[in-house]
């Protein structure tokens, strides 16, 4: 930047009109203007219906009409940059989960995330020019102190009006922050981020705020600009609108939110007086008429605009827009510029790259630099509301009901989404997706990441598996796993597995009665009930290895076939169902951390399945005492097919929900679940729903049953292409599409989602090397591809 002589370099401070803070949230400019800035989180838009977005646009236009004043200007900035806050330190119980988290961060996320930051700036100019601020601390300026006070009061009133109207957008007013006894100006940091596309702390100084911001050298040329820092340099280029789109719509510039490189989008809007606005419209109309312009429609629209302006349907303002993109070298810059230009052209604008005006265009990005604005144009507040929508991709939450976010995913915009398992304090989650889409892998990944919430709280995870799909995760994290068998001793022997307690007595009485009555031949007599109670008492007084259903049966009468003893006979060892609950050993060992049960072979055996569920849930119930607890169920539709099992599960889940518990369910098609009364009830209670792409998705099931919006249904059925490795997360607080692409982590996928051949291969390794994960897991992950079908 050359000075007036043309031979010396002009100081960047010339372009930085910021004197300093007059309060924590207000900054004084050299021309006497004052400004305040806010960071805007932004509203989710990707899956919003058009009606909602149009309503927000109308509300924003109404706000602009309410604050319209020719001494007020608004700046809106979008800064897309790679300064993404790191994930919090993660602590796990098992080495596998820690390794999984680290690999996911490094292979899937590292270097692939960008952040979108919106900023809103309000500037109030003085009613009368006060002269240069450096001459302001004089007697003349002291006479104007009352004007500054009124100006500040006006700005505060504006801020409160704007903050109230845009509360849902997540506004946070920037001010002064303290870190390690040093004060930093957030306004200065935001201005520097707008200037450079990089975040750098800016301390509060006693001198000029502008001077404290300009610490890197900016060199502007016709082909672009260069920013030189002490450690590196990078280049940029700026694009502006030569002609505006014929029409505007909400979020029309959101195409920039997902570009894979840093950029700064700047827009300013300075309100015009009503007379100035009418003059501009009248002048344009007169020019077209006097030149014989045949664009009758445009002339008519100008007349309509004058009527709308007179009716206060909108206000007019001087608008300026520029897009600055950055790259490490000129070759990359040219490629990025072409892509950005195409995106803007797709929005309907005629875009031009700045050349001679590069220097002015660069400095015009900063709030208050009106004189450097290139190609300003008059637009309506409705147009401005469409161009500046303050929409963004959801960023999730850094903390929730159980502490820090347990995982970070990548959104469609390449931005981070921090995942917490709860919506408010409700941890009910349902995962839907056709077979082979990856829902089991995602479910087990979440279970592994949940170790962070459990490790210091004595929390526990219990999962009901299908076809041993989650067995390897359970074993890799040091848990216990039991695959229940059919036709051979199942592994369940309640009389041998329960301790001699009052709770065990009560449970066994109800459970044995249910076994007897499962034949559908009615209840048992009071006498038989008394004999049963005595028998249970006697059995539990024995050592566990001496207990059996066959021994209990001896306490019941050897009477007719309709008697309780005869009806219990089939459940005794050596009889038709003796294998189910009267084996030599009860293999239910609840791990204090994670336990898995595979009931695949019992699901179609109604009588056995319901009784097995009752026993398992009784054992598990001891862990549901207020500590953190997670119950997971893969392919849970299969469990709903058994009414007795479903009834047992429903009763148990009520206990889970009341005692700080979580539930994660996974199944293929929602319509199968919604057909069940319990299934529909469970899904309704799931505040978090996760959907995988489904080209055959049933409209009624998704929209009527699962309450998806039209845009969400469209994403599930069409937009999320099969094989894209994306899922849609739906919550009341907003929906988002995230990537879960583990193609660079195939050895971990082999553990998260077991197949018949990989499970057998792991069995072989464990038989030779032992069950401790440290003995077999690393070899399995290195050789899993050797597994034979």
Swiss-Prot record:
One of its GO terms (biological process) is protein secretion by the type IV secretion system. GO terms for cellular component: type IV secretion system complex. SUPFAM superfamilies: P-loop containing nucleoside triphosphate hydrolases. InterPro entries: CagE_TrbE_VirB (IPR004346), CagE_TrbE_VirB_cntrl_dom (IPR018145), P-loop_NTPase (IPR027417), T4SS_component (IPR051162). The keyword Nucleotide-binding applies. Residues 1-38 form the signal peptide. Pfam families: CagE_TrbE_VirB (PF03135). ATP binds at residues 433-440. A possible function of virB4 might be to provide the energy, via hydrolysis of ATP, for translocation of virulence proteins of the transfer of a T-DNA-protein complex across the agrobacterium membrane. Belongs to the TrbE/VirB4 family. This is Protein virB4. It comes from Agrobacterium fabrum (strain C58 / ATCC 33970). The lineage of its organism: Bacteria, Pseudomonadati, Pseudomonadota, Alphaproteobacteria, Hyphomicrobiales. The gene is virB4.
